């Protein structure tokens, strides 16, 4: 093990190799060293590098005295236990390394009682390379020394010689075995919850993987649509089924069909036709018969006989009709004894509730086989509607007499001239016609005086307006009546309330409030006085009553006296009743 070793010359390396020889057993198992920073080599598998490394002093500018040497510092005991605890927690399973570390500690701390000399640290160590502390046991034997101890060209050989001179005088304390054992046990006991959680998750994941591995995989069933035929095949099958059904129904109908009699006759005639033809041919061949003349019927030759036959036919029809009427009259059902008999309640309810289950209905609709003539019916309907249509009355002009001929007329100059010229002319003079002023007089009148014909539309319009006005008047009257009725009701309610108050013997709360308040206050005072009086009486009884022990002693004394009295009476041969009767007799005397 080397402490404070720099990247120096071969002398220091040889010295450290002689003091701390490397172990060949640990070199095979321990990994290679890690190199940090500027030539700082730390073994990865060595667990005492933190414990043995002293504090680094990197602040070179703050040293005001300019000293080039310093004393090595020994780590405190508490920091040492923390480092050991962390080291043992990092690898608790390696028993071989733990044994080797214990041996290193024993060999390193065997010089515990020696003093700590003050060794000066050259300045080149502080500025050249960082101080390192590593275990030689953790270094593998096959690694070359040049890789473990890199050389530095910056430092002079005097500095290496000074380091080799004071490195052998360093004393590092060694922990006890009990402390190491307790630290190892504590590391095993103080397992972090994160490790438990990680183990639990790992076990859960492993269980899920095992369940997934044990799961059996099966192929899914073939879907149903794979077995379905194509659309064309479905349609062909449907068409074949339809044709087969049609053929079967046709055969069924033909099997149930019954031929008519004339069809049979026609078939028989067709079958007999060849025979008749052969018979006719044979008759013609044998001998032609003589033509026989048919007799004329008497109805043709004698007209009176035909009339008689018609009368007999008519008489027969009349008799048939009369016989039918008689049979109908005789076949009528007898009159029932109880007419209009009401059905029972159960029957009525059954008819009402179970009418939808009825199969035999009273109403039997009759189908009219004759198709009506809709066009003729529509024309007849239009004709009837035109006849019933209301025709508007036309305006009829009534003649009137104009009295313009009776008005006086003054001749004008033009009329006089015409009259003078007329004397000369051979034409006869015409009678002067007065001018009619009827039109001018009528024009001077107002429009209301003109004779106007009132149509049905105007009459209906006036009636509608009149009805609307009447409705409005009625609604106004109803509103007014409601207002008057409301006012009357309010006045009546006021008068009723006033009369009820006047007739009611009870008084209002405002009138009785003061009297009730006074009465309640007086009752409270009386109750308080009675309560105080009862309290005083109770206190007096308590004060005058003897104590409990006095009552007990008095009762005991009384019982003793009564017992003595009974004993005395028994000794004298007397009874209590005899003595009591005698005492009552003496008191009465």
From Swiss-Prot:
Sequence segments annotated as region (Disordered): 1-166, 265-297, 386-444
A Pfam family hit: FAM161A_B
Coiled-coil annotated spans: 510-577
Lineage top rank: taxon: Eukaryota
Biased composition (Basic residues): 287-297
The keyword Coiled coil belongs to this UniProt entry's keyword annotation: yes
GO cellular component, one term: cytoplasmic microtubule
Compositionally biased tracts (Acidic residues): 92-106
InterPro entries assigned to the protein according to its UniProt record, in alphabetical order: FAM161 (IPR051655), FAM161A/B (IPR019579)
Polar residues: bias regions: 151-166
Sequence ranges of Basic and acidic residues compositional bias: 265-275, 386-396
Presence of the UniProt keyword Coiled coil in the record: yes
Key words of the record: Coiled coil
Quaternary context: Interacts with FAM161A.
Similarity field: Belongs to the FAM161 family.
Protein name in UniProt: Protein FAM161B
Lineage, broadest ranks: Eukaryota, Metazoa, Chordata, Craniata, Vertebrata
Gene name of this polypeptide: Fam161b
């Amino acid at each position: 093990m080397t402490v404070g070793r720099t990247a120096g010359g071969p002398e220091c390396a040889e010295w450290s190799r002689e003091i701390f020889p490397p172990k060949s057993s640990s070199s095979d198992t321990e990994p290679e060293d890690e190199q940090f920073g500027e030539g700082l080599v730390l073994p990865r598998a060595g667990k005492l590098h933190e414990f043995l490394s002293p504090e680094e002093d990197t602040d070179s500018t703050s040293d005001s005295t300019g000293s080039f040497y310093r004393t090595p510092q020994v780590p405190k005991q508490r920091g040492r236990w923390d480092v050991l605890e962390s080291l043992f927690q990092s690898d608790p399973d390696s028993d071989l390394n733990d044994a080797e570390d214990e041996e290193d500690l024993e060999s390193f701390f065997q010089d515990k009682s020696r003093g700590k000399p003050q060794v000066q640290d050259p300045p080149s160590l502080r500025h050249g390379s960082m101080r390192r502390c590593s275990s030689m046991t953790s270094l593998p034997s096959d690694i070359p020394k040049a890789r473990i101890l890199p050389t530095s060209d910056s430092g002079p050989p005097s500095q290496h010689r000074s380091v080799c001179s004071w490195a052998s005088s360093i004393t590092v304390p060694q922990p006890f075995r009990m402390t190491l054992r307790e630290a190892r046990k504590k590391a095993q006991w103080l397992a972090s919850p994160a490790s438990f959680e990680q183990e639990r998750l790992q076990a859960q994941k492993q269980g899920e993987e095992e369940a997934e591995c044990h799961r059996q995989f099966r192929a899914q069933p073939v879907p149903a649509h794979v077995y379905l035929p194509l659309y064309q095949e479905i349609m062909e099958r449907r068409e074949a089924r339809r044709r087969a059904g049609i053929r079967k129904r046709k055969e069924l109908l033909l099997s149930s069909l019954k031929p008519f009699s004339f069809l049979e006759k026609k078939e028989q005639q067709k079958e007999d036709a060849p025979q008749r033809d052969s018979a006719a041919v044979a008759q013609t061949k044998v001998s032609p018969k003589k033509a026989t003349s048919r007799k004329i019927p008497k109805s043709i030759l004698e007209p009176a006989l035909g009339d008689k036959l018609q009368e007999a036919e008519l008489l027969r029809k009349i008799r048939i009709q009369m016989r039918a009427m008689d049979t109908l009259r005789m076949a009528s059902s007898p009159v029932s004894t109880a007419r209009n008999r009401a059905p029972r309640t159960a029957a009525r309810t059954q008819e009402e509730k179970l009418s939808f289950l009825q199969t035999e209905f009273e109403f039997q609709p009759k189908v009219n086989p004759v198709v009506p003539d809709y066009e003729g019916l529509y024309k007849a309907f239009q004709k009837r509607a035109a006849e019933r249509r209301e025709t508007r009355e036309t305006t009829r002009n009534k003649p009137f007499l104009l009295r313009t001929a009776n008005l006086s007329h003054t001749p004008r100059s033009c009329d006089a001239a015409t009259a003078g010229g007329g004397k000369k002319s051979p034409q006869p003079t015409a009678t002067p016609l007065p001018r009619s002023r009827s039109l001018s007089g009528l024009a001077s009148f107002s429009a209301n005086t003109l004779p106007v014909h009132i149509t049905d539309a105007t009459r209906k319009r006036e009636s509608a307006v009149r009805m609307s006005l009447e409705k409005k008047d009625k609604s106004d009257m109803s509103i007014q009546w409601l207002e008057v009725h409301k006012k009357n009701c309010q006045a009546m309610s006021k008068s009723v309330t006033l009369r009820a108050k006047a007739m009611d013997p009870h008084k209002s709360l405002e009138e009785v409030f003061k009297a009730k308040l006074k009465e309640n206050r007086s009752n409270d005072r009386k109750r308080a006085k009675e309560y105080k009086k009862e309290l005083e009486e109770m206190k007096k009884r308590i004060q005058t009553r003897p104590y409990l022990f006095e009552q007990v002693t008095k009762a005991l004394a009384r019982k003793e006296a009564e017992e003595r009295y009974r004993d005395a009476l028994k000794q004298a041969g007397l009874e209590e009743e005899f003595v009591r009767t005698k005492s009552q007799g003496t008191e009465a005397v």
